[in-house]
Amino acid sequence: MGFNIAIDGPAGAGKSTIAKLAASELSYIYVDTGAMYRAIGLYVYRKHVPEEDTNAIGETAKETEVSIRYIDGERHVYLNGEDVSEEIRKEHIGHMASVVGAVPDVREHLLSLQRQIAQENDIIMDGRDIGTCILPNADVKIFLTASAEERARRRHLELQSKGDTTPYDVVLADIKERDYRDTHRDIAPLKQADDAVYLDTSNMTIEEAAAKVVELAKAAR
């Protein structure tokens, strides 16, 4: 049985970057559930399935096999055998990940795979409902957040560094829309687990936040 750390929080809070750093420091496996949803979002997008047709999204998701492999320390995400690691980081695929994540059949499709990985390894898993639904018995639970404006600022800088010219206002509006969708969906809405540590990173560097995660993990072992 692995030692499991669950990190939940809203879009753009830096969960992935912080979890990755902490996992490296602890020599744990980092499981990016968001990347799994992005991969399915990409597949649904390619198939031109309407966003509002949840039945079709659920059926289309069943055609996918998503896996994560680490090659020379770098994470690679595979969709039906194709490496989609770069393509899933695009902004419109982030939007699609939020759409498919609200569909029960999609969540069910990924749940067993995520739990199996956690059972067999020491892991840090981040997402929207890890501590509340996927790993309710995780050894450490953290709710990691930052203000919507700070999250939009970070995301805007990241997009600019990749040559993406999406305006800040559009990024902020998208983050607020995703917050609303994630907290109001019927299945596993985003919320802090009762036994989770609340960690606001608005005024922290990524390194400071990762160090806090490592500290919490070591205290719990």
Segment roles from a protein language model:
Residues 12:
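Walker A (P-loop) phosphate-binding loop of P-loop NTPases
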Residues 25-90:
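N-terminal phosphate/diphosphate-binding loop that engages ATP/GTP or pyrophosphate donors
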Residues 34, 81, 110, 124, ...:
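Residue-level signal for inorganic ion chemistry
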Residues 7:
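Hydrophobic anchor at the beta1->P-loop junction of P-loop NTPases
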Residues 85-162:
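ATP-dependent NMP and nucleoside kinases share a basic, alpha-helical "lid"
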Residues 69, 114-120, 132-133, 137, ...:
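Small-molecule kinase domains that catalyze NTP-dependent phosphoryl transfer to phosphate-bearing small molecules
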Residues 18:
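Hydrophobic positions on the alpha1 helix immediately C-terminal to the Walker A/P-loop
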Residues 15:
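Conserved lysine of the Walker
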